[in-house]
């Protein structure tokens, strides 16, 4: 039978659903909200791929340079919500040059042209200017949600444009941004008829806000569920705001400090007593311990408590947390100490996530391994940990691994580099190996302390589901990196700093990088020659190098043996970016 006959036979044998119009499949795809499920289904045939493209309503771009904005808009024309991430994660620790890039403007301009019905925008670690915010306000007539996380480049003038122009805004969520205060009363730009706000978070804003305007806004937005205040809100005004919004589910208190007065305490206690729906509480910066009992009436209902900026310590903090028996998420400073975590262990057996931050990265420290061991033993639902401390033992890590094999995220940050087991003086290889061998569902891991290549051999062999790995001051040869890149079959992001890893494992495992989202290496043993070879070998990867500002010579003039201070490699379908600053060079 010839080719034509084969095609005819196949067409005749095709199931009847093959002839259904694309509109039917587009409707069917609306029942697959998960991106992984949609991607798997779209690979079945060309009509399903076409239907998935046309019906997609949400788009997440993990690297703003992985695709060209206008190509993304053209490929997915019906998007209503977009999330775009910019600078590498190590930007949070000051390792990425401030002028690296990640401008939001190209994405907003492309969205304005191709997604006129866009309702939501989220940017993380990107440069968002006032002009960007003005374009958002002017371009999308039904815009409802703006989330900016760890962004910079804008001011309160841009926020004023959002307030004045986005008449259907439901969420304005500003987290950990650097915002210039232009002394503009931007909250007053919300029209008096505006009532749609559900989330308002301006906790990162440094300047003053007009309290009267804020109170009027909160009063008329009856569906407001989340309110996070900055540290300029006086404590007596917090009580007034709570009386006007007793329906709040999440509250960021702001500074929470004032001279103690019994009448103010009574007002706060009464205000919190009226918040019957409050489930998530944060803030309490510089909290005065005498006011903490005002929280007691809401403790039983709290599922999330973020005190990562609260410097309160001692019995007052422990009394407070011991009343929060339904907590699922707890963020605190190490001022809680081991005794406080023992109370958490006995009181909060529904805990799922624990983060403990250092109060003084250079101080003596208040926390040991004991607190984490206690929590792991008593909280059966615990699956995510970020723990800063100054000492650890292999025995403790092995115990934690046995107690909680259900960990999906384990990030241990021992503040002093190359710190061994403080009892045996041995490397912490055995402890971290126990974590990856016991916790088979682990997706995110950060390791620290004195570690040899043996721990990387264990990670490469056992961490099959690991997606993100952070390594600092660890390993003793190229073998460590080789074990990671030749194993860890699900790895998407790898970030490394101050490790003795060089060219050989990078080039030997170059193909692995095409299956990953990104690789960051800084203060390692890489050379320019290896980066050149990698770029030639893997043309679909963008290979960026960053050296000290004083070393901005053209790459062509530098020999292969030139050390590379910082390397960032990522997969892209857009080709080399065109906005590289002087401190960044593409190989």
Swiss-Prot record:
Where is the stretch described as Interaction with auxin-responsive proteins? 92-93, 358-363, 413-417, 472-473
Which keywords are on file for this protein? Auxin signaling pathway, Nucleus, Ubl conjugation pathway
Q: Which cysteines are joined by disulfide bonds?
A: none
Per the record, the pathway is: Protein modification; protein ubiquitination
Residue numbers marked as site, Interaction with auxin-responsive proteins: 150, 176, 388, 497
What subcellular locations does the record give? Answer: Nucleus
GO cellular component: a single term: nucleus
Positions binding 1D-myo-inositol hexakisphosphate in this chain are 85, 124-125, 355, 409-411, 444, 492-493, 517
**GO BP annotations listed:** auxin-activated signaling pathway; protein ubiquitination; SCF-dependent proteasomal ubiquitin-dependent protein catabolic process
Q: Domain named F-box: which ranges?
A: 6-63
Extract one GO molecular function annotation from the record. inositol hexakisphosphate binding
* Free-text note on domains in this protein's UniProt record: The F-box is necessary for the interaction with SKP1.
Q: How does it assemble?
A: Part of a SCF (SKP1-cullin-F-box) protein ligase complex. May interact with auxin and auxin-responsive proteins.
Any other comment in the entry? The myo-inositol hexakisphosphate acts as a structural cofactor.
**Protein name, please?**
Transport inhibitor response 1-like protein Os05g0150500
Q: Which organism is it from?
A: Oryza sativa subsp. japonica
